[in-house]
Amino acid sequence: MKPGDFSARQEFSHQLVKAAVERTQHAVRYDPAYVRIPYPGGDVPADTGVCTDEVIRAYRAVGVDLQKEVYEDMKKNFSEYPRRAKRPDANIDHRRVANLMVFFSRKGETLAITERAEEYAPGDLVTWDLGGAVPHIGMVVDQKSLASGRYMIEHNIGRGPKIEDVLLSWKITGHYRYFGPASSASASRSDQQQAR
């Protein structure tokens, strides 16, 4: 997918949002436990997960393996990521909000952090500080709140996957768009050509 390919990006976002909305049909118990999982394509048990697992599972449904993408980028650029261990760990690194923030800023688009709800589009990823430096992540979906008129968020804050009007409920710390590895490879080539 070329960076300027608007229709391909629009279709990708549409499919990604559909996958995120579908996640609300699953019963998921909030469980942040460290679990050894296969690589690539590994996942914690389907009935467990945290906020990051909702993002991971939505992307996986459209053919993007964030476990692999994050791990591969961390292997090459470990110093760019927050340090929790001495080396990348494919079992857990993609399940950490701080790592996803770095990954999406490196491989996707970093967008303005604003309280203007109209700046957030379906498929956008939003991160928050829930207070006490507790991070959270969710995805903007194409359903609007009847009360506020804002696009709502698919996320798991401890009650399983839900769609709720929570965009402005906490301090926003990140706003991203990520269209998969083909998009970031194209963007990287474009950046290299512009640098010449």
Question: PLM ranges: what are they?
Answer:
Residues 12, 17, 75-154:
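...with weaker cross-activation on analogous glycine-rich loops/strands in unrelated enzymes
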Residues 1-104:
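N-terminal capping segments
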Residues 38, 82-84, 144-146, 158, ...:
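Generic alpha-helical propensity signal that fires on short helical segments
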Residues 38, 42, 74, 78, ...:
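Residues in flexible loops and secondary-structure boundaries
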